[in-house]
Curated annotation (Swiss-Prot):
Protein name: Pyranose dehydrogenase 2
Induction / repression: Constitutively expressed, but on a much lower level than phd1 (only 0.2% of the amount of transcript).
Lineage, highest ranks first: Eukaryota, Fungi, Dikarya, Basidiomycota, Agaricomycotina
Organism: Leucoagaricus meleagris (Western flat-topped agaric)
One GO cellular component term noted in the UniProt record for this chain: extracellular region
Keyword Secreted: yes
Length: 600
């Protein structure tokens, strides 16, 4: 797939003009030496990802405050391929990716997994599949309870989510009627959202299934009403111009020139600014061979480097478990063993069914030309199939206690991908043994996801080199209940495609083979096929002020420090039953208001 991306480079050169025509209010600098002298920054945001740019944008609304954002990756203006919805699956493994790999996973037979994380301005909102899900109300109420932060309750965050959303009721002349519930959406916010869909016969057959098997797969008018159970039209962060809407294109582009953005620059450490607990200074460099520089924020430093890099930066700064830091030669300034622990993610597997349905393939070069000329065609869509299904398993299929946050929360997600002879590029690492393409015909392909993994992983350090990749251990299937739930998800999917609606057009599974039906055989298949769904959170988890666990307090301040907060996916205590993009936006909006209010 990378070779295909290389072939597209010549087409993307013509699209580079798109970036040069966009005027940021913020001022972007390509190198630390380019930063203006004599500017004192009130706030420094270490990491220009989804959350970091929300925080920078909101703080800059006070025109008296100067804000600096430091981002390791390039500007999204310099990566025009990230703006095209139809290229989303091509981005992992490219220049906008950290290209992490996990350590071998014991329960997966020693397989290591690719762990894609965005390395570009806008972070994962510039690099992800653009799916817009808020998660169940149960998750938000659970987070509020375990963190002792009532501001996170569903009834309190729903207005935030609606206020930040700019939902479009039509897209490329497609009406949204019957695809969403307008009452649960906002229409005047920063982040553009649509419910775009392709007109394929598969859609109608899915809807027939919701009538035939309504108990397991009811039709859900809107997956973002707080009770996502059933089959619904997918919503995406795409704007009316058929381009990706990210924190870079929505929030950052609305700021004034009191925001400075330094790209292609690596944050190496957080540094004490004068006493043992005041961490308002940040150390950074272009690469390992470049000189390091230090800047100090007048008010606060906000760490927003993501679920992997944020704990890595804290540990390199001396904030972490004492024994672990001493072992790699880092002086311990704040002893907190919770740093880097509690990595909560979702396990998924690809399923393929032999089918006679029309395929969803298209000519990529022609589609790029169409998008370039008219912002229409296949590249205007984030996916070739446009439904999500959320399944709640019955109690007798849970192998013990219910891991979900409540009765309105699903355990399983189906994300439909494509109908094709080609295999999908993004979520199938090289370590997974897929069928030989020559041995299969046209196949329906989709992901089955265990939304509530009990197993927790970690991010630790190999050494004290801030430019070295950290050790990522997902501990996938460390708890047997996780593989049991995913196994039931596979069986649920087979029931869906054994329905009368699909009887004559969808046939036996080819991955896993049709004969793989017993618990033992399905588990063996999952151990060789499961991958991360790349929704990791929790490595710097929020917890109550008085808690003996966790890394940040409900006000996002790092425990035991002053002048330092963390705002990104790492503070979310547990992965939601959904995609993480919108919870990250919402946490960032909440944090921004707290920070601003503390100085007004």
């Amino acid at each position: 797939m990378l070779s295909r991306v290389a072939k597209l480079n010549s087409r993307l050169v013509s699209l580079a003009l798109l970036g040069s025509q966009i005027a940021f209010g913020a001022i972007t600098y390509q190198h630390p030496d380019d930063l203006p002298s004599g500017v004192d920054y009130d706030f420094i945001v270490a990491g220009g990802g989804t959350a970091g740019l929300v925080v920078a944008s909101r703080l800059s609304e006070n025109s008296k405050w100067n804000v600096l954002v430091i981002e390791a990756g390039p500007s999204n203006k310099d990566t025009p391929e990230t703006r095209i919805p139809g290229l989303a699956d091509n981005l992992p493994g490219t220049r906008t990716d950290w290209n992490y790999t996990t350590i071998p996973q014991d329960a997966l037979g020693g397989r290591s997994l690719n762990y894609s994380r965005a390395k570009v301005l806008g972070g994962c909102s510039t690099h992800n599949g653009m799916v817009y899900t808020r998660g169940p109300r149960d998750d938000w109420n659970y987070w509020a309870e375990i963190t002792d932060n009532q501001a996170l309750k569903w009834d309190n965050v729903l207005p935030i989510m609606k206020n930040t959303e700019k939902f479009s009721q039509d897209f490329l002349d497609q009406s949204m009627e019957g695809h969403i519930d307008p009452s649960v959406h906002g229409f005047d916010g920063m982040l553009s959202v649509v419910a775009s869909y392709t007109n394929v016969s598969f859609n109608n057959l899915l809807l027939e299934t919701t009538r035939e098997l309504s108990d397991e797969f009811p039709f859900k008018l809107d997956l973002n009403d707080g009770k996502p159970h059933g089959l619904a039209w997918t919503q995406y962060t795409i704007d009316q111009g058929a381009e990706r809407s990210s924190s870079a294109t929505s929030y950052l582009e609305s700021t004034g020139d009191n925001v400075h953005v330094l790209v292609n620059t690596h944050v190496t450490r957080i540094v004490s600014a004068g006493n043992e607990t005041d961490f308002r200074s940040v150390e950074f460099a272009v690469d390992a061979n470049s000189p390091k520089k230090v800047l100090t924020a007048k008010k606060e430093l906000i760490l927003s480097a993501g679920v992997i890099a944020s704990p890595q930066i804290l540990m390199n700064s001396g904030i972490g478990g004492r024994e672990e830091l001493q072992a790699i030669g880092v002086d311990t300034l704040i002893d907190n063993p919770s740093v880097g622990r509690n990595l909560s993610d979702q396990a998924s597997t690809l399923l393929m069914f032999d089918t006679t349905l029309p395929n969803t393939d298209y000519d990529v070069a022609a589609a790029l030309t169409e998008w370039d000329n008219s912002r229409s065609g296949p590249m205007a869509y984030a996916a070739r199939l446009n439904h999500l299904t959320w399944v709640r398993l019955p109690d007798d299929k849970l192998s013990g206690s219910d891991p979900s946050s409540g009765h309105d929360s699903p355990h399983i997600e189906f994300q439909f991908r494509q109908i094709s002879h080609q295999l999908p590029p993004a979520d199938v690492p090289n370590q997974v043994q897929l069928p030989d393409p020559d041995s299969i015909g046209v196949v329906l392909q989709f992901s089955v996801v265990n939304l509530y993994s009990i197993s927790l992983g970690s991010v630790t350090l190999n050494n004290n080199d801030p430019f070295a990749d950290p050790i990522i251990d997902l501990n996938m299937f460390g708890d047997q209940k996780d593989i049991a739930i995913l196994r039931e998800g596979v069986r649920s999917a087979r029931r869906m495609f054994s329905s009368q609606a699909f009887k004559n057009v969808v046939h036996e599974t080819v991955y896993p083979p049709a004969g793989v039906t017993s618990d033992e055989d399905l588990d063996a298949f999952l151990r060789t096929s499961a991958v991360s769904y790349l929704h990791g959170v929790g490595t710097l988890s929020m917890s109550p002020h008085s808690a003996s666990w966790g890394v940040v307090n409900p006000d996002f301040r790092v425990k035991g420090t002053t002048g330092l907060r963390v705002v990104d996916a790492s503070v979310i205590p547990r992965a939601p039953a959904g995609h993480t993009q919108i919870p990250v936006y919402t946490f960032a909006e909440h944090a921004s208001a707290l920070i601003a209010d503390s100085y007004n």
